[in-house]
Amino acid sequence: MLFRSVAGCDTPYTIPLPGRHHVQDALAAVAVCRQLGLPEEAIRQGLEGAAVPGRAQVFPNHRGIRVVVDYAHNAASFRAILSCLHCYPHGNIIVVFGAGGNRPPMRRLDMAQVAAELADCAIVTTDNPRWEPVEDICRSITQALGRQIPWEVIYDRREAIFRALDLAQPGDMVALLGKGHEGYIETCGLRLPFSEWTVLEEYFHRQP
């Protein structure tokens, strides 16, 4: 995304992240760097290389589906990333998400409401259930979704991702929200290895 700061400098900056919320973060970084006396060219080059794993990270594929992996795990970050996706030409937006266990229950309800508002279909699945039954977490989410959009519950996150990709048509978007850069699922005191990027590689490797 290309943007310009004001404050007496007309230098154009580019960041490898979509969305106005990332521009806001970048502007804050520019302000701090200027206060520290860094040259504008160094700031510009730094921002150009500021890709963050698991933050609006697009998985390239040959099927014409825009697949985005993002760490969004509350209503505000859900709204930010899904609103960002609406800025691009797209068909349906399919969102795959769950909610962390042993966290304020209202958080998962708020995320569900944002998903219902900004997505066309939801696959509800496991996030980090910790010590809370994943069935209870998913039930809370689907109750909040109600009949606002079509949804399915698939507890196995790998299978949930596969299902979303099977449903997607060229031009659609699939947003995998909640895990981002994390390489595990936390449940019952254990951190079980899990990488959404690896799951995506597995899926598309199987595709003709």
Task: Put a short name on every predicted segment.
Residues 1-2:
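Short, small-residue-biased leader/transition segments that mark boundaries at the very start
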Residues 21-22, 57:
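C-terminal accessory "lid"/substrate-recognition subdomains
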Residues 12-20:
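A short glycine-threonine-serine/GTX helix/turn-capping micro-motif
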Residues 6-10, 64:
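Glycine-centered tight beta-turn/hairpin loop motif at sheet-sheet or coil-to-beta transitions
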Residues 28-208:
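ATP-dependent carboxylate-amine ligase
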